[in-house]
Amino acid sequence: MFNITDKAKVYMADLFAQQDEKDLGLKVDIEKAGTPAATVIFNFCFPKELSKTYQKFEYKGFDVYINKLNFVYLKDSEVALKDSSVGKKLIITAPNAKGEEPKEDAPLEEKIKYVIAADITPGLASHGGFVELVGITKQIDVILNFGGGCQGCSSVKSTLEQGVEAQLKARFPEIKSVRDVTNHANTDNAYM
């Protein structure tokens, strides 16, 4: 399930040996598991503070704690040690962390959520923004809510029409319209 190369094990054991705290473990989590925005995160942890959903894996010099709910996403993953221009660094390859694109026969809502997460939100994130699906009407109107830097942004109309709506309609021609229900009067976080 979760493989650590021999070089990475030695490097990690050395990192643990350098810590002042001796009751540390390595917690492996996945933010947004199963979505295109999934990120695997390593953190030192105090095992006694972890919930019972974490399973312990023992290695020479350190222990790893993984949330059982993430096992499926960490299947076939590997932690390796790589040399870089700034020294050594741990690299994790987790081919199942992001889940799979919905099948052709999946519900439209599921497919739209995937496209928003995989293709649209990463572009908006460069301005601190995001968009989320609120719902789909019976007439197949897609209802969206923008947030972060997109909420109150002066360019949100063109972002909606030329970016988001164009991408969604190109992928899903059955969509009649794409509507924004965001309260753009709030410009506290707007990208300007």
Swiss-Prot record:
Q: Where is the signal peptide?
A: none
* Alphabetized UniProt keyword annotations: 4Fe-4S, Iron, Iron-sulfur, Metal-binding
What the protein does comes down to: Involved in iron-sulfur cluster biogenesis. Binds a 4Fe-4S cluster, can transfer this cluster to apoproteins, and thereby intervenes in the maturation of Fe/S proteins. Could also act as a scaffold/chaperone for damaged Fe/S proteins.
The name of this protein is Fe/S biogenesis protein NfuA
Cofactor comment in the record? Answer: Binds 1 [4Fe-4S] cluster per subunit. The cluster is presumably bound at the interface of two monomers.
Oligomer and partners: Homodimer.
- Named cofactor requirement(s): [4Fe-4S] cluster
**Gene3D superfamilies noted in UniProt:** Fe-S cluster assembly (FSCA) (3.30.300.130), HesB-like domain (2.60.300.12)
Q: Does the keyword Isomerase apply?
A: no
- Where is [4Fe-4S] cluster annotated to bind? C150, C153
Picking any one GO biological process from the record gives: iron-sulfur cluster assembly
Question: Which branch of life, at top level?
Answer: Bacteria
Q: Which family does it belong to?
A: Belongs to the NfuA family.
Task: Please name the GO terms that the record assigns under molecular function.
Answer: 4 iron, 4 sulfur cluster binding; iron ion binding
**Which PANTHER family has this protein been placed in?**
FE_S BIOGENESIS PROTEIN NFUA, IRON-SULFUR CLUSTER SCAFFOLD PROTEIN NFU-RELATED
The gene it comes from is nfuA
